[in-house]
């Protein structure tokens, strides 16, 4: 009888171990294909742009006033807390995100000057800096032009690539709204797997090709606040049906809203 019980326990332990290993394998496969794992990628690099570029972006007073209103309006702010443990497995970072997002639809509703700037003068500025003909992305997508707010201790987003759902190249521009140093920095890993940090202060903005740049926002310290304006641009707005579905799922997970 004791031998029988021992064998049943042993079989159960093997079953749990097999399930655990299967889950780990699935997570690694998902991470590899979704942008969670650091991998070697071939990318376009020239004198005009190579993975990222820093340049100053200045906002007019009427735009700053709109952003001040947005950042004070708690009703339109969506906090997303995605917590997984451990934070990394081997060379893959598990989905971890803590912070507030004000999505595009609220920017359109409450900040018309900002949207006009995003679609016109800012688009032209980024196009000149990168020497590319860029286009704004669809305003019905929640991350097209969004405000990112980190205000609680530990707010951050883990290492990841920005999956490119478009037929053309895909770029993200980050503009600092709070122009002072915090623990939350824009960080990326270079080809040598070294962590590099960029301080987004004093109007210093960064435009990067997130599909090829492995990056994160490091964790915020206590009694700090960081506000970033995130703007997305592409060389071709067309998107396949499958990628459109995948983008909807991603937006729902990270923003809590579905795009068009």
Question: Where do the PLM segments sit?
Answer:
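N-terminal auxiliary "cap/dimerization" subdomain that precedes the catalytic jelly-roll/cupin core
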Residues: 9-101, 116, 120, 255-260
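Signature of the catalytic double-stranded beta-helix
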Residues: 91-144
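Conserved short histidine dyad/triad with adjacent acidic residue
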Residues: 148-164
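Short, charged/polar surface micro-motifs in flexible loops or helix N-caps
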Residues: 124, 150-155, 178-182, 213
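Short, conserved beta-strand element in jelly-roll/cupin
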Residues: 166-182
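Catalytic core of Fe(II)/2-oxoglutarate
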Residues: 180-260
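Intrinsically disordered, low-complexity terminal segments enriched in Ser/Thr
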Residues: 3-5
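Structured loops at beta-to-helix junctions and adjacent beta-edge loops in soluble globular domains
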Residues: 54-55, 148-151, 176, 209-211, ...
């Amino acid at each position: 009888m004791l031998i029988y019980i021992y064998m049943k326990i042993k079989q159960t332990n093997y079953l749990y171990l097999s399930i655990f290993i299967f889950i780990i394998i699935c997570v690694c496969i998902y991470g590899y294909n979704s942008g969670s794992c650091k991998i070697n990628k071939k990318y376009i690099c020239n004198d005009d742009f190579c993975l990222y570029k820093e340049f100053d972006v200045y906002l007019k007073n009427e735009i700053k006033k709109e952003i001040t209103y947005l950042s004070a309006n708690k009703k339109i702010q969506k906090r997303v807390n995605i917590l997984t443990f451990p934070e990394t497995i081997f060379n893959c970072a598990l989905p971890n995100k803590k912070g507030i997002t004000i999505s595009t639809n609220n920017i359109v509703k409450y900040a018309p000057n900002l949207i006009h700037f995003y679609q016109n003068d800012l688009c032209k500025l980024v196009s000149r800096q990168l020497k590319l003909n860029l286009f704004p992305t669809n305003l019905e997508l929640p991350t097209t032009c969004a405000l990112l707010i980190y205000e609680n201790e530990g707010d951050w987003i883990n290492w990841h690539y920005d999956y490119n759902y478009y037929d053309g190249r895909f770029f993200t521009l980050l503009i600092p709204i709070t122009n002072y140093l915090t623990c939350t920095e824009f960080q990326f890993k270079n080809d040598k797997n070294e962590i590099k940090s960029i301080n987004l202060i004093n109007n210093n903005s960064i435009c990067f090709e997130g599909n090829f740049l492995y990056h994160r926002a490091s964790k915020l310290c206590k009694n700090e606040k960081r506000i970033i304006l995130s703007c997305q641009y592409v060389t071709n707005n067309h998107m396949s049906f499958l990628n459109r579905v995948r983008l909807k799922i991603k937006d729902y997970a990270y923003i809590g809203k579905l795009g068009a």
